[in-house]
Amino acid sequence: MHTGIAAAFLPAFCIVAVGAPAQTATEHRKAPEWAISEWINSPGLTLADLRGKVVVIDFFQLWCPGCNKFSIPLMHHWERIFEQERKDGRIAFVSIHTVFEGHSYQRPKRLRTFVEEKNITHPVGIDRHADGRRLPITMERYRTRGTPEMAIIDKQGNIRFQQFGYFEPDHGERLIRTLLAEETGGDT
C-alpha cells in the first residue's frame, strides 16, 4: 500500500456532495452515534458500547471500486497488524454500508453475500435512511463525502482522523498506535 498506487484508482472513488464543509484529516470533534438498520457479524453495536477503545470505521458501498481496492484491503491489513490489541479489547473495527446511490442493487441480501465473499468478519452496519432522504443518517452525521471514507476515533469518542478517498496507510497506522498508547481519560 504505497502512494504510487493512488493514481491507479483515485478516479474510481464514489463521490457525493452532502452540502457539508470538507473535513480535514485531523479534525477533532465528538463522534456522533451511528444509525444502523441492520447488523451483519454482530447482534448490534453502538458507539457508546465501544467507549474506551480505539475505533476504526470504514464507510463503504459494496459496488465502490475504491472501497474494493483500498479501504476493504486496508481494514484486513490493520486487523492483522492489530490482532492482539483487538483480542485484548483495545481496538474495534467497524464497517458502515452507506448507500447513497444504486439502492436497488445494494440490498442487504447482496451485502451479506459480499461480506462473506470478502471475508469481512468485523461488524458491518447498514446505514439507516430517513423517510424521503437520499442520504443515509450516519453518512450525514459524519459529513462523509462519498466512499470510501475512513474515520479513526479515540478512546474518549473523538474523531481524530477522517479522510475521504486514498490516504497514506502508514499515517493511519501511526495514529492508531499513538491512540492505543494514550491513557483512557475523561471527556476532552
Regions found by a protein language model. Give the residues of each.
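Bacterial N-terminal signal peptides
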Residues: 7-17
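N-terminal "domain-start" segment that seeds a small globular fold
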Residues: 21-48
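Short active-site neighborhood of thiol/selenol oxidoreductases, capturing the structured segment around
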Residues: 45-68
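Alpha/beta-hydrolase fold active-site loops
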Residues: 54-55, 91, 148
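Structural microenvironment flanking redox-active thiols in thiol-disulfide oxidoreductases
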Residues: 68-118, 129-138
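Thiol/disulfide oxidoreductase modules built on the thioredoxin-like
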Residues: 118-120, 126-175
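Short, solvent-exposed mixed-charge patches
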Residues: 181, 185-188
